[in-house]
Design a protein with these regions (language model features):
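A cytosolic-side transmembrane-helix exit/cap motif
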Residues: 60-64, 89-97, 116-123, 180-188, ...
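Alpha-helical transmembrane segments and their helix-entry boundary regions
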Residues: 40-43, 54, 69-70, 97-101, ...
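Helix-loop-helix junctions within the multi-pass membrane cores of secondary transporters/permeases
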Residues: 71-163
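Membrane-embedded alpha-helical modules
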Residues: 126-216, 223, 227
Length: 231
């Protein structure tokens, strides 16, 4: 079978790109009173993190110090270290620069698309991953810039429900992956792992921040998966 390349990666990321445009518009509209389209564009190019950018806008709105903004972004994006670490195992024989560029543009959604592709093939072409990442990256950039530009024209953007787009996209990706995983992993094992992640997340919320709770709950879920595989 012919190995999938850059444009197949772009095609695989189309659902993610559509979701990014929608939530990017929402982010831009919400941020329009506090940042210009140019500033939002630079934020999207160099930060490129939906939840972190929403947090940045909220902190900018209350004139929080730069150190507080930087620390918040770091904690929110901490989980991406874990995702990049795992994704890099699929590109062991790829050059360092390929891995750096792929990890720099990796998000929850592009990682999810990669995991879906891994179900169908044992080897993923690095160019496929670049296509997956770049389509999502450009879509997010365009969505946020256009949203900021149009922000002043929409006095009540909440009525469009754009803030739910990211949640809907996550649900769609998870549902698709869960259906695929059922064919390879016993349902009992899947529910045990999901239960560990869910329970540990809510327990951890009582002692650490939400970002750290996500990270630690994910690690506990991975640990449980390893334990179950060893049985």
């Amino acid at each position: 079978m012919k190995e999938k390349g850059f444009w197949e990666g772009v095609q695989a990321a189309v659902p993610t790109a559509l979701g990014y445009i929608s939530i990017g518009l929402a982010c831009g509209i919400i941020g329009s009173p506090y940042v210009t389209p140019v500033e939002m564009g630079l934020m999207s190019l160099f930060v490129y993190a939906g939840s972190a950018q929403f947090a940045m806008i909220a902190l900018i709105a209350v004139q929080a110090p730069v150190a507080a903004i930087a620390m918040t972004v770091f904690l929110i994006n901490l989980r991406l270290f874990l995702l990049s670490l795992h994704a890099s195992t699929y590109f062991r024989h790829t050059s360092l620069w390929h891995n750096i560029s792929m990890s720099s543009l990796l998000t929850d959604e592009t990682y999810g698309v990669l995991m879906g592709e891994r179900v169908h093939t044992d080897k993923v072409n690095p160019m496929w991953m670049h296509g997956n990442n770049l389509n999502s990256y450009i879509s997010w950039f365009l969505g946020t810039v256009v949203g900021t530009t149009l922000g002043g024209l929409l006095p009540n953007p909440e009525v469009f429900g754009l803030d739910f787009a990211l949640v809907g996209m996550f649900i769609g990706i998870f549902t698709s992956q869960f259906q695929i995983m059922q064919k390879r992993i016993p349902l009992r094992k899947l529910f045990i792992i999901l239960g560990v992640v869910a329970v540990s997340f809510f327990v951890l919320l009582t002692v650490v921040s939400q970002s750290l709770a996500v990270l630690f709950a994910t690690l506990l879920g991975c640990t449980m998966g390893v334990i179950l595989d060893g049985q």
